[in-house]
Amino acid sequence: SSMTETIKLMQSHSSVRRFKEQEIPQEDLNEILKAAQMASTWKNFQSYSVILVRSQEKKDALYELVPQEAIRQSAAFLLFVGDLNRAEKGARLHTDTFQPQGVEGLLITSVDAALAGQNTLLAAESLGYGGVIIGLVRYKSAELAELFKLPDYTYPVFGIALGVPNQKHDVKPRLPLDQLVFEEEYQELSVEAIEAYDRVQAEYAGARATTTWSQRLAEQFGNPEPSSTRENLEQKKLL
């Protein structure tokens, strides 16, 4: 079969939000982070940084801002930061103008961070650890900037809580592949397809389900985004 160990690992991913009280050895963290660093990056700029949080005090302070149990329980919490602070230092060797403000800079930094983040999670899972990516940190950008001393030209993109798993979930059903991968040109989905996927998701979630998949889309995108994200980006000179 063409199923490698790598593919098996990738296809069996599920988020882990509960962890045992066990540390991740430094050696394992080093290997995980070296794997993260080899992710593809735009022009090799490496426009992200990682803040490794292991002190319980820091994790608790973060939990106060972003009350996700995975943060408190994690052996290590990794904050992925979109980062053009190094870029500014490099660019200023050659130019007096540094103008990273705008959408392109945000895309470059967040894509770089995301690719490194996915490598991080896969490397950790390959060593038997589990984790969850937490995007909610963006809603507390200003507070996190203070907590982690984030300078100009940086912003939190997401965090990853890592640890020894204390729970096991079934793999969450994704959309049928042909509704996500289109041969040669885009095909818009029918309302029926969305409703069918609502049913698949409801079946998977069972008693835990409080809203449908499409209801969650309405909650996320039915209103203007919170102003805090934009305000922090402006404050950090990225917008």
What does each model-identified segment do?
Residues 1-239:
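Acidic, surface-exposed loops and disordered segments
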